[in-house]
């Protein structure tokens, strides 16, 4: 005899992508609760138009974050966590980038934001629109790390693009340029 919980309790390994020519990509978008239906309507247009291979969606409630600079919840939000499959090719990556940017624009148009980041697909303009305290965050980062010891691709794309990141002619070295 089996209980319903036993029958419905499959391990996550059954969802694991075992195809060498594709990969699964998580996206997460945060939208004010009152606009979730409009956001879903926009996604119903965008995803098929961009031929997105959506595998799964999880919805969760997010409380307001008043503590962090890069907050994704400026008020109560609903988050859509979406799992997409994409080809591991330059074309697959370009398609996912285009899809992502359109979904970010849809979230932004409703006062929402995107999660930071699973992929660096957001333009610097989209990033700064979604995270208005980013400039202050990057200023603090440079204040506490003036030599640029701690860097990653996120910082190189969005922090160096930030106004004032080239202060006094100082450009932080990319990791490959630094001697150890």
What are these regions (language model features)?
Residues 13-14, 108-180:
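Activity-critical C-terminal alpha-helical subdomain
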């Amino acid at each position: 005899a089996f209980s319903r919980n036993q029958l419905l309790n499959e391990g996550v390994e059954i969802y694991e992508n075992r195809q060498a020519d594709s990969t699964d990509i998580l996206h997460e978008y945060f939208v004010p609760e009152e606009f979730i239906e409009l956001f879903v309507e926009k996604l119903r247009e965008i995803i098929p138009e961009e031929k997105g291979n959506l595998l799964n969606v999880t919805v969760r409630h997010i409380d307001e974050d008043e503590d962090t600079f890069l907050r994704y919840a400026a008020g109560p939000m609903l988050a859509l966590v979406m799992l997409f499959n994409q080809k591991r090719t330059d074309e697959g990556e370009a398609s996912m980038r285009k899809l992502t940017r359109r979904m970010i624009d849809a979230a932004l148009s409703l006062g929402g934001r995107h999660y930071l980041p699973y992929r660096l697909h957001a333009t610097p303009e989209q990033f700064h629109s979604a995270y208005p305290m980013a400039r202050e965050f990057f200023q603090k980062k440079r204040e506490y790390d003036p030599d640029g010891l701690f860097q990653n691709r996120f910082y190189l794309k969005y922090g160096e693009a930030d106004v004032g990141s080239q202060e006094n002619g100082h450009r932080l070295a990319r990791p490959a340029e630094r001697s150890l």
